[in-house]
A protein has these predicted regions:
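Repetitive helical segments and hydrophobic/amphipathic motifs
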Residues: 12-13
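Bacterial N-terminal signal peptides that target proteins for export
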Residues: 1-9
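A residue-level marker of the well-folded mature domains of exported/periplasmic proteins
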Residues: 23-382
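C-terminal motif of bacterial Sec signal peptides marking the signal peptidase cleavage site
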Residues: 17-20
Length: 382
């Protein structure tokens, strides 16, 4: 799951950028000031360019979560050209206020609307009920409807590959983890990373600092510097900016990028980045809506689907043994021969949680609320 907290906005009344692309057009408009009462549905696919909309919690920038989604939107434009008109709405806060945006996009004839943050869920459920001829897709959610599907990526697989590298590289045996908010997705990532790092080096300790936000460069810097002060010589993150990488570069230690390739923000510090590729899913979904074959089947892609991978591995900083180990683990996960959450797995207290030979199923992974052995830190109360 993803994006459960509200990114602070200057004002809910502030203008939100909307850019429409396709047919060589590029226009902007403001998000609606109030929820639309219109019940119009999008025109059937095939009658002129199909309207496809993306709702972003932030702006794409040049790295991170929204940037990764934007690359998927660009891939749709490149694939379909003047067969689609792609609209983006940026900086849309989570919660009830986002409903205005989804209703506006649906009433203006978009046939397919992607909501790329967890906190849009209830707004999308309500809007989908009133626009049955529009297809809605919600990233990281779990509520569906006949015209509302959900999709996500197994980021924990990318975190696990990073852990393989981290276990090889650390000299202090302390790895710092800058974490966003304590939801199953993030806990899963921390655990998968730690399992891999300690498989390589059982002495590794993974120290976690929470910032309780997806994007807060100031807090991200404070957390990263605090972890360096605690002896971390490798940093991992589950936050959206590249500040953690920049801190690593300044402190002359190493770090991993998250959601996209962050190597340019710390060329010497960068070990690798766990990067998401949404393009295949977005292209496939657009095609299904165009062809009338779309179904609201939940999708959780990963390494097998080439939707998450460890990219831009720094050959100068990552030893050959680590690179070979990552390649082998990648292939094992891809081929279904390995799952990071296969027992025996012990919790922080040393007690067995997953017995030998058992693999946690997806429902169990979605509800994970505990740290594995080797993690130092606690789960904040919600």
């Amino acid at each position: 799951m993803r994006r459960k907290v509200l990114i602070t906005m200057a004002s809910l009344a502030a203008a939100m950028l909307v850019s429409a692309c396709g047919k060589q057009e590029n226009t902007t408009a403001n998000a609606p000031a109030a929820a639309s009462d219109a019940q119009a549905s999008a025109a059937p696919a095939g009658k002129g360019p199909m309207g496809v909309a993306f709702v972003y919690i932030g702006n794409p920038g040049d790295a991170g979560w929204t940037y990764a989604h934007e690359q998927g939107a660009k891939a749709v434009e490149a694939k379909y050209g003047d067969k689609v008109t792609v609209t983006r709405v940026e900086n849309v806060p989570e919660g009830a206020d986002s409903e205005r945006v989804f209703r506006d996009l649906a009433s203006k004839g978009n046939k397919l609307v992607f909501g790329t943050s967890f906190g849009y869920m209830d707004s999308m459920v309500k809007t989908a009920a009133d626009f049955p001829d529009v297809t809605f897709e919600h990233a990281t959610g779990f509520k569906s409807a006949p015209n509302l599907g959900t999709y996500d990526v197994r980021t924990y697989e990318g975190a696990h590959l990073a852990g393989v590298v981290g276990g090889h590289v650390t000299k202090s045996n302390v790895i710092g983890y800058v974490a966003s908010v304590p939801i199953p997705e993030v806990i899963r990532n921390i655990d998968a990373f730690t399992i891999a790092a300690r498989e390589v080096n059982p002495k590794v300790k993974v120290k976690v600092v929470w910032i309780n936000s997806w994007f807060d460069p100031g807090k991200e810097r404070q957390a990263a510097e605090s972890l360096v002060g605690q002896g971390a010589d490798v940093l991992m993150q589950n936050v959206d900016s590249a500040v953690v990488m920049q801190v690593a570069e300044e402190k002359k230690i190493h770090a991993f990028g998250w959601d996209s390739d962050m190597s340019k923000f710390g060329p010497n510090a960068h070990l690798a980045s766990a990067a998401i590729d949404w393009s295949k899913y977005y292209i496939r979904t657009v095609d299904e809506v165009m062809q009338g074959t779309w179904k609201n089947t939940p999708v959780w892609g990963g390494i097998k689907e080439d939707e998450i991978n460890l990219v831009a591995i720094n050959d100068k900083a990552v030893p050959e043994a680590a690179r070979k180990a990552v390649a082998a683990r990648h292939d094992a996960i891809r081929d279904g021969k390995y799952d990071p959450f296969t027992g025996p797995i012990k919790g922080q207290d040393g007690k067995e949680i997953v017995p030998a030979g058992k693999t946690m199923n997806d429902d169990e992974k979605h509800q994970i609320n505990w740290f594995v052995e080797g993690v130092e830190g606690s789960l904040p109360k919600q």
